[in-house]
């Protein structure tokens, strides 16, 4: 059986990247929450 996680940096950045987050209201709220929480990284690094 094929595993579900097949890593790809392109897919990773397109779905979870900073610009992807900024594109929608929900994504901006995610960043806002992470800033409020004091996260060192707001989005996963590629």
Swiss-Prot record:
It comes from Halorhodospira halophila (strain DSM 244 / SL1) (Ectothiorhodospira halophila (strain DSM 244 / SL1)). It comes from the Bacteria. Belongs to the bacterial ribosomal protein bL34 family. HAMAP family: Ribosomal_bL34. InterPro entries: Ribosomal_bL34, Ribosomal_bL34_CS. GO terms for molecular function: structural constituent of ribosome. Keywords: Ribonucleoprotein, Ribosomal protein. GO terms for biological process: translation. Coiled coil: none annotated. This is Large ribosomal subunit protein bL34. The lineage of its organism: Bacteria, Pseudomonadati, Pseudomonadota, Gammaproteobacteria, Chromatiales. PROSITE patterns: RIBOSOMAL_L34. Pfam families: Ribosomal_L34. GO terms for cellular component: ribonucleoprotein complex; ribosome.
């Amino acid at each position: 059986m094929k595993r579900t996680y097949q890593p790809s940096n392109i897919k990773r950045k397109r779905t979870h990247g900073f610009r992807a987050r900024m594109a929608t209201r929900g994504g901006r709220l995610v960043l806002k929450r992470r800033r409020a929480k004091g996260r060192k990284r707001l989005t996963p690094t590629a």
